[in-house]
Every structure is written in C-alpha cells, then in structure tokens.
C-alpha cells in the first residue's frame, strides 16, 4: 500500500524532502508491497472517505480509539467538510458500521509545510463494539516515556503492491532512532514528536495510507499516525515519518475528555 504523503515538488535544492504539491496528492494513494488482511485482523482500522471544500473526495486511514472517536492525520482533513467513516471490514468502502462525522478537530499548531503536529480527531456517533470493531489501546504509564526504538510495528491501509486492490493491506516497519532518520531530511522535519520507520526492504506506506495506524501488535498499542515519506518516493528506502502518539496524549485527552 502506498502510504501518505509523498512530498512532491520542490525545495529546489539537492534535498530529498519536498513540499507537497497539494494536500490532495498526498492523500490519494496506497501501501507498497504489503500483505493482504482479513476482516477482524485489525478491528481498530478505520477507512475515511473525506469530502473537501471544493467537493473533491480523498481517502485516508484512521484508528478507532473510543466508540466515539477516530484518530487520524491533520493533513487528511485539511479543508474537509465531512467524513464518512467505515469500520469493521477489510474491504474498502464497506463496513459493519458506516457513520458520518459529527466533528473534526485538527491540531491547532499543524504546519502543512513541515507536517509538524500532524494529528486530528474525528467525532462520530456511538458505535457498538463487535469482534470486528474494537478500539486500539493508547500509551499510558511508563509507555509514555518509551521511544519504541528497534521494535517492529505494523502499519495498515488500503494499498497496492503492483495492482489496485480494495482489500486492506499491512506491512511491518522497524522503528529507528530519530538521529538516524534526520540524516535523510532537512533540519526541522524530524522532531521529538516524530517517530520513524525503516523502509529499506521496500515495504512502505504511501499516498492514501495517511492517517493510518502504526501499532505494536503484540501489545495492541498505537504508537504512530502515518504522516509523510521522503520526496524521493515511497519505494526509495528512505524512512517514513509518523506522528508520535505519546507526544499528543494530553491533546487527545483534552479534546475527547477521555481518560486513558
């Protein structure tokens, strides 16, 4: 599946990082070289059909964190007027529950040039939990101080290997330290609130996987939100950037009222 944001046009330097040509281009796309999931494998996975102010529609991923809240990327809902949320199915545009957004909250300090603070919340009507619809756990206690380096985590989204697919895809990326990750980006892009994943094996998120979950599967723990890849391309082997969930727990609690 191709994940997220490829920074398309130019710093007009030798830098691999590029500013996005448009938010639309960053959100449409798929996971690369992933594996096919089945319904119920990732019961927290949300599919987001987003309508923008100019009536264009884009697709992103998200994570169910409560029966009324979805966590996603701010760049996904930039200029959004409404979101249709699909839950409980591995098939794109299908869901055991299909609901309309009630409220969209982007981080007030989101920077569309650097993708700093690239997190957003979507409030939805109450959904009932089932075998195929379950919330993902968020960090708490000592986990809030954990950088999760050198641990494999799972990223999922509706992607493509070599062909278009409507089936949820997933792959694994190794969490790497930010100093190593920062070597591949200009100064100021990789910050404390970024968590990076290695993609040197050719498996990466890309367009359309934006906002999706980055999860420690053995702990059912959400550690990242898909945010960006290098302007060199999704298959370049450059690290992928996620918004670090531990950096935003206070913000999530303040805006949802949920105590995790």
From Swiss-Prot:
Enzyme Commission identifier(s): 3.4.21.49
Principal cellular location given in the protein's record: secreted
Signal sequence range: 1-16
Record has Signal as a keyword: yes
UniProt key word Secreted: yes
GO terms assigned for molecular function: serine-type endopeptidase activity
Thermal behavior of activity: Thermostable. No loss of activity occurs after incubation for 2 hours at 60 degrees Celsius. Inactivated after incubation for 2 hours at 75 degrees Celsius, however 45% of activity remains after incubation for 20 minutes at 75 degrees Celsius.
UniProt similarity note: Belongs to the peptidase S1 family.
Functional summary from the UniProt entry: This enzyme is a serine protease capable of degrading the native triple helix of collagen. Also cleaves the B chain of insulin at the 15-Leu-|-Try-16 and 22-Arg-|-Gly-23 bonds. Hydrolyzes casein, but not Px-Pro-Leu-Gly-Pro-DArg, BzArgNHPh, AcTyrNHPh, 2-naphthyl phosphate, 2-naphthyl butyrate, 2-naphthyl caprylate, 2-naphthyl myristate, L-leucine 2-2-naphthylamide, L-valine 2-naphthylamide, L-cysteine 2-naphthylamide or L-glutarylphenylalanine 2-naphthylamide.
The protein's name: Collagenase
Organism of this sequence: Hypoderma lineatum
